[in-house]
Amino acid sequence: MNQLLYSKLNSLIKVEPSIATSIGKIQLDKPVMLASGILGISLDVFNRLYRSGAGAVVTKSLSTEPWEGYPNPTIFSVKGGGWINAVGLSNPGAPNFAKMIEPNQNVPIVVSLVGSIPEDFEMMIKQFKNCKVLAYELNLSCPHVAKVGLEVGDDPELVTKIVTAVKNTTAVPAIAKVGLGASNYLNTVSTAIDSGIDAITAINTVRATAIDVETQRPILSNKFGGLSGTPIKPIALRCVYEISSKYNVPIIGCGGISTWEDAVEFFLAGASAIQLGSAIGDNWIGVFDEINKGIVQYMKRKGFSTIKEMVGLAKKS
């Protein structure tokens, strides 16, 4: 059924568009997810986010053992919009976190994992054997912690070993979260796909810094952090467009998304779902429902019945 005909029928019978979406094997009732790094800390919070319209929640990146992270200051509000953070991947460790979410039966949880070697990921996944996990997101792109994140993602051989180990350890879908590092990020995408990854999240924060002109020193204790929010949206959108143009892989768009218009742009560029984080700092958790409703109204106006009909349309113009 073409779009014009559907639009006319829709106006007559008032069919509500569906915002359910699939990211390969991963099924979501709603396309807007919580990104890793913000609020992904407790089951109570996860339940509240889910009730507020999040299609899934991604946990903070978890390590094999608890990490304290960096001392304050760890976050800086950028003039004109956005944030630079260098929290240092503070987290309670995968074993402790698994015990905390074990009672969950309702919330679609994506567990974010960070490590240096394949054995790290194998060990962490085994901790969740009694948990309801929608997917694992492999953090191959944190820009401000040594020996993990981007340092792993920039090493094709290590990416191959990690993705292979994960796929051999669990039948739960695995997502590679990529970012802009020293090498071409598309090499990370290609390597992950060749190794059997189920989907790609693009992108992580972008390495950045800020300096206090009075003290004449970097503001963050770690000197460098990751830039998130509105300033990186065009970069993230470009990456999603490039990945979807070059590879046949499900994509989750992430980076600077705060409105339904942003979400639709990412769908049109090739993403099947989106994640947001910094927008919560500005709009709190009502942003999920607000974006979902905006997407539905757009779909009604344009005659779309499903998210899938929008995915990648910008590449056909």
Language-model features and meaning:
Residues L113-T170, V178, L186-A199, I203, ...:
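Conserved alpha/beta-domain cores
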Residues D44-N47, F121-Q127, A182-S195, S245-K246, ...:
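Catalytic cores of alpha/beta
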Residues V32-S36, V57-T59, I109-L113, Y136-L138, ...:
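Hydrophobic faces of well-ordered beta-strands that scaffold small-molecule active sites
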Residues M1-I109, V114:
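N-terminal capping/small domains of soluble enzymes
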Residues T59-T64, L140-C142, A199-T209, G256-I257, ...:
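Glycine-rich phosphate-binding active-site loops on the catalytic face of alpha/beta enzymes
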Residues G82-A86, P143-E157, T188-S245, V249:
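Glycine/Thr-rich beta-alpha phosphate-binding loop at enzyme active sites
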Residues G37-L39, S112-S116, V178-N184, V249-E261:
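Glycine-rich beta-to-alpha transition loops that act as phosphate-gripper elements at the mouths
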Residues G69-G80, I211-G225, A279-F304:
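C-terminal helical cap(s) of enzyme catalytic domains, especially alpha/beta-barrels
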